[in-house]
Design a protein with these regions (language model features):
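Short, well-structured beta-strand segments within conserved domains
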Residues: 106-110, 133-148
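Short beta-strands within extracellular/lumenal beta-sheet-rich domains
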Residues: 86-99
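Aromatic-lined ligand-binding clefts that engage carbohydrates, nucleic acids, or primary amines
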Residues: 99-100, 104-118, 142
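Short strand-edge motifs at loop-to-beta-strand transitions and within beta-strands
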Residues: 94-96, 129-133, 140
């Protein structure tokens, strides 16, 4: 109880317990349940299948912490690729949604960057080689395939950074 009171009294006062309104951070995620059917669908095709709608996929809602990070240790992982050794974690699949209110340029900052494949809709996106995107207005689905053996079990975060000029106006979709 004492820890809960200390935590609640820190909300909004300490930087790690403060939500900054000028930052666009994904806070609501959907994680792909680690079912045998989902693992089979991805293994049979490729990891890009996670960016598509598939009848064997069951997505569950997860929320990031106040700091904007989603602990990967709490995200389901599955053996959905060949060549895994005993003890390998395999991969996790998550998605989030952004609403582009005004078209323009912006980039995604994703941590960890190692071992993460990204799709905007069903189009592959490599933050390292093409950091800025020309966004069109409307809802955008961002899907991540995370190689857990490369990325580890630390926190996952996705931030949107728009330049001051010709930048897109984007908000992260929240709610339940």
């Amino acid at each position: 109880v004492r820890d809960l009171v200390a935590f609640l009294s820190s909300l909004g006062r300490l930087p790690e317990f403060t939500i900054k309104p000028d930052q666009i951070i994904a806070r609501r995620w959907q994680t792909l349940a680690a079912t045998p059917q989902a693992a089979h669908a991805i293994t049979r095709t490729s990891i890009k299948t996670a960016a598509q709608e598939h009848p064997d996929f069951v997505w569950q809602t997860a929320y990031s912490s106040v700091s904007g990070s989603l602990p990967l240790s709490e995200v389901p992982h599955m053996h959905s690729r060949y060549g895994l050794k005993p003890g390998d974690l395999g991969a996790s699949y998550v998605r989030t949604y952004l609403e582009v209110l005004q078209p323009g340029r912006a980039k995604l900052q994703i941590e960890p960057s190692k071992g993460v494949s990204v799709w905007i809709g069903e189009t592959p996106y490599d933050p390292a080689t093409s950091p800025e995107i020309d966004w069109t207005a409307g809802p955008q689905k961002i899907t991540l395939a995370i190689d857990r053996d490369a990325a580890g079990s630390g926190p996952l975060s996705l931030r949107v950074v728009a330049p001051a000029e010709k930048g897109a106006l984007i908000k992260a979709v929240g709610g339940k």
